[in-house]
Amino acid sequence: MNLEEEAKKFMQDKLIITEVMTAEFYEMKASQTAIFPKNQALEYLALGLTSEAGEVAGKVKKLIRDGADREDYELKKIAIASEIGDVLWYCAMLATEVGVPLNEIMKDNLKKLHSRKERGTLHGSGDNR
């Protein structure tokens, strides 16, 4: 599938679901497509997440390397968005696997980030800052 076909498919797929998208709804719908070995679910999902994140990085790298005219740039951004969707799927399935709803992870992450911002510790490294 070439880049233009991939972009068209992504846009068509976006139009199928018309409900308001929530993390809970996404997690439920995504889990209906989950086919992987349940006895190694955590490992499988973590490796899948890493693989898909690598695909995002690869597409961004090629965009930087090759440059693009405006039309090609927009198509490549759509392809990147499609890969981000795959990353999201793995995040949702990992959340399900560890037994914490995705929306709770999202809320907790925002609380953590806002706390760091208020304390001036967004920069730096380490989980406990």
Segments (PLM) and residue ranges:
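Flexible "arm" and connector segments at domain edges
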Residues: M1-I84, L88-R129
